[in-house]
Regions:
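Conserved AdoMet
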Residues: 2-111
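Active-site catalytic pocket residues across diverse enzymes, especially alpha/beta-hydrolases
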Residues: 102, 128-132, 158
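Extended basic-aromatic, gly/pro-enriched interface segments that bind polyanionic ligands
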Residues: 109, 134-216
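Conserved hydrophobic/aromatic pocket- or pore-lining residues that grip, position, or stack substrates
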Residues: 98, 115, 154
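Short, well-ordered amphipathic alpha-helices
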Residues: 97, 121-131
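Conserved strand-to-helix beginnings and helix N-cap segments that scaffold or border functional pockets
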Residues: 41, 92, 121-125, 155, ...
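Conserved class I S-adenosyl-L-methionine
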Residues: 107-123, 140-142
Length: 216
């Protein structure tokens, strides 16, 4: 007698087979151009199970069918699966090179194509402001990301105080306000610096990009 053995994890609310994970990988690459590592299987289940539950669906197949036809759910799908790891001046030598380049060339447009929560474009803006000795410069800084949630955080410009710990004191004083009272433990990018950066939602797989060149 042959006994069929189910591969379903009995601890999971929804069935999640290898084929379901592969379909998620294909959908994310098709819609956002993002390659999802095979090591992310547990993360995918955890994050998308919440969406399946929220939409009162019964399976990953039903959910992906919804993603395929609903722009609003596609946005939720992408937001759920994008991982945003960033920090101010994350690669210091890049910003040293940028400062040198600004001194030697006529730069008019800078595009940060995966801006996440804004630390990188604001770091660029600090370097530009220092190079020109002013917040008012001829340089236009464009920052884009596919994730609408991280863009909202970037536009707000509010961060944990610990996130600027490695930034020199003179930059902290010039470019950030420290929170008080209920905002203690937070910092906010000064308005003059925020105004130097234009944030846009943009999918790099789209045929046309809402970014005007030339870019430096």
């Amino acid at each position: 007698m042959t006994v069929a053995v189910s591969t379903k994890d009995s601890t999971r609310e929804f069935a999640f087979e290898k084929a379901d994970f592969k379909n998620v990988q294909k959908m994310l690459f098709k819609k956002a151009g993002i390659n999802l590592s095979d090591a992310k299987e547990a993360m995918v289940y955890s994050r998308l199970a919440r969406r399946i539950r929220a939409r009162n669906l019964r399976s990953f197949n039903e959910y992906l069918a919804l993603v395929n036809k609903s722009e609003s759910e596609l946005e939720q799908f992408i937001n759920a699966l994008t991982t945003n790891l960033t920090s101010f001046f994350r690669e210091p030598h890049h910003f040293t090179a940028l400062a040198d380049y600004l001194r030697q060339h006529n730069v008019t447009n800078i595009w940060c194509a995966a801006s996440s929560t804004g630390e990188e474009p604001y770091s660029i803006a600090m370097v530009v402001a220092e190079a020109f000795g002013s917040f008012k410069t001829p340089v236009k800084i464009i920052a884009s990301d596919i994730d609408s949630k991280v863009l909202a955080k970037a536009r707000a410009g509010v961060y944990p105080l610990a996130s600027i710990a490695k930034i020199p004191h003179h930059r902290q004083k010039q470019f950030f306000h420290k929170g008080k009272g209920t905002n203690e433990g937070k910092v906010k990018v000064v308005d003059e610096l925020r105004n130097m950066v234009q944030f846009k939602k943009l999918n790099l797989t789209d045929a046309k990009w809402d970014v005007k060149g030339p870019l430096d």
